[in-house]
Every structure is written in structure tokens, then in C-alpha cells.
Amino acid sequence: MKEQITLDMINNFSNTYNSNSFNRIIENAITENGLEKSCIDKRIIEENQPVFNIELPDGKRYDQKDNYRCWIYCGLNTIQYDMAKNLNIDLKKFALSNNYIAFFDKLEKSNNVYQNIINIQNTDWEYVDKEDILQYCVNEGGHWQWFVSIVNKYGLMPYEYMPDVFESLRMQNITGLFNDKVKKDCIKLLNAKRENTNIDDLRKMKETFLEENYIFLSKILG
């Protein structure tokens, strides 16, 4: 195939497109109604009506706002329903703290990053950068198994004892600051490894960093 797109190619593409009248029908539908509406198949909608024979009680609703904790909200919603049912609690008056889970999520993720740096054999910065070890070191995202691990280790907290605060619903800036701090800590660990610091001292450094992270998160999330 030629390296450059030629006008002959464009003419051939155009002729192929225009030779199929169905393309023009699709084009008109999308340009007039948008892609999403144009893709709707009414027969599928008619065959799949949102009618259910089981209705679950409705609990409190919380605005996720500017954070990426959908995985935490989903996990807590599942647990809250079962807890309210088993303990005979009014679901509309009961909620669990997503902020509590998010606190330990960040602390655990920072620990994992530190441990990865301690375990790494090649301390060359270009290698670390190429392996993307620090690119997304402490993010907001998560999944069910990660949620389960945090709950099994740290338990749960009623929402009223650790509610959402100003920054907990606007976590992008805080996550950025926290990542910067963790990355700086990792550079210190890498430098210490290059100086052949023994494993016990590296672990002490990590514990110091984790204590700082705990204080950081406590001041911001409560």
C-alpha cells in the first residue's frame, strides 16, 4: 500500500460509499437524529419491557459527584440491603460510609506501590518509567474483589460516623496531590536501594511514608 493518501484513493472511497444507497439512508438518519437514537431497535425494546416480579426496598440515594467510587457505592448498596433486612433496620434511615472505604483504599494502594518498588530488581528510573509502575499508582478506580478485601480487613463504618466531606466528593485534586507525594516517596526508596540499603531499613522508610499518608488522608477525609 502506498505511504500517502492520494486523491485517487479518496475518489475510490467516495464512489464505493455512494454506490450503496443504504449508506446514504444511514447517514441521513444519524446526521438528523444522532448515532444513539438511530441505533435504537424498537422491536428489542418492546420485547424487553422493564417489568419485574420482585421489588426491592428503596434506600437512601447519594450523589457521587466528582469522584470515581462507583465500585464502592455498588458494593455498599449490596451490603446495606442485606444488613437492613437481617437486622430489621429501616433501609431509608441506614447507610454505610463510602468515605471510610475510600480512605483505606488509598492507604492500601500506596502500600502496594511502595512494596513494588522495594521488590523491584532494576532500580534504573527509565525501567521503572517504562513499566508504568508509577503512572497510575493511586487512582480512584477499583473492582469487587478489591472492595471485598478492604471490607474483610477493615470492616465497615456507618455513614453518620464518617460522612462525605467537602473534598471526598471532589477527589481529583486530592488524588493528584496524593500521587505526587507517593511518587516522591518512591524516588526516595529507589535512591535508597541504589545505595544498597538493607531490607529492614527500606521497610522502616515505607512505614514512615504510610504514617504520613494516614495523616494526610485523615486531615482531608476525616
Features from the language model and the residues they span:
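Catalytic-core signature of thiol
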Residues: 1-222
